Amino acid sequence: MSFSGEHPGNANNEGPPPPPPPPPPPSHSSAPPSSQGGSARAAPLNGAFHSHQPHSQGYARAEGSNGYRQPYGRGGYRGSGGRYYGGYGYGHGGGGYGYGHGGGGNYGHGHHGYYGYQGEYRGHSGYQRFNSPAPVGTRYSGAAGPAARPPPPPEPEPEQPFELTDDPLFHLTELDRSTDDPRQLDEMRRIFKDSVQLDQKLEQQKLAMWRTELELSLLDTQSAKDALNVQLNQENLDALLMQG
């Protein structure tokens, strides 16, 4: 049911329209300041642009030398350093983003670390560093530091080199590993050395005995020859005596 003075199009009034989205970021080339949106302009001061426009419902529109009008902002924006002075707003300047609120604070110079976000906040009292805690379940996906190297394996103990004077059986029978007492090892080495020396002397005695046996056999042969010669000479003498 509608009254006669009511406009039919206002029956379904859903409130004021939402604010328009911000325009795309402008290029880095400088453009002359716009003359729309108020009677006051932003005056450059060391790369900073401060707005002097009248406020409308607590908000104002600021613009800088890059031709970009900052929506829903109160105060000024420093484009070269990513700083925003004044009320709530968002802007993009020549080389950096800026966001801020309050009397003279800025938010920027941040970089991501291993966990959370690190940056600097400068208010009236100067620069203050802050580290925001990482949310629960946050995991840094960047390149991790170098992994710790595992400890090297223990080097094997060098084997004891064989002495040239040792008997091979002393190592083949692993008697050198049977004990760690150096005295016992020296005693076993001495026994093996004596055994080797005795074997060598025994071989020498055997060689001498074989030499003697050979000489004896030669003497026996010579003795047999001499006996035959004596017998032959005796027969020759007997034959001469019978002829005479």
Swiss-Prot record:
Biased composition (Low complexity): 28-44
Domain of life, source organism: Eukaryota
GO biological process assignments: chromatin organization
Protein location: Nucleus
Bias kind Pro residues: ranges: 15-27
GO CC field: nucleus
Ranges where the record places region Disordered: 1-81, 132-164
UniProt keyword annotation of Transcription present: yes
Keywords recorded for this protein, A-Z: Activator, Chromatin regulator, Coiled coil, Nucleus, Transcription, Transcription regulation
Main subcellular location of this protein, as a coarse class: nucleus
A matching Pfam family: Lge1
Function: Involved in transcriptional activation. Also required for ubiquitination of histone H2B to form H2BK123ub1. H2BK123ub1 gives a specific tag for epigenetic transcriptional activation, telomeric silencing, and is also a prerequisite for H3K4me and H3K79me formation. Its precise role in H2BK123ub1 formation however is unclear.
Protein name in UniProt: Transcriptional regulatory protein LGE1
Origin species: Eremothecium gossypii (strain ATCC 10895 / CBS 109.51 / FGSC 9923 / NRRL Y-1056) (Yeast)
Lineage: Eukaryota, Fungi, Dikarya, Ascomycota, Saccharomycotina
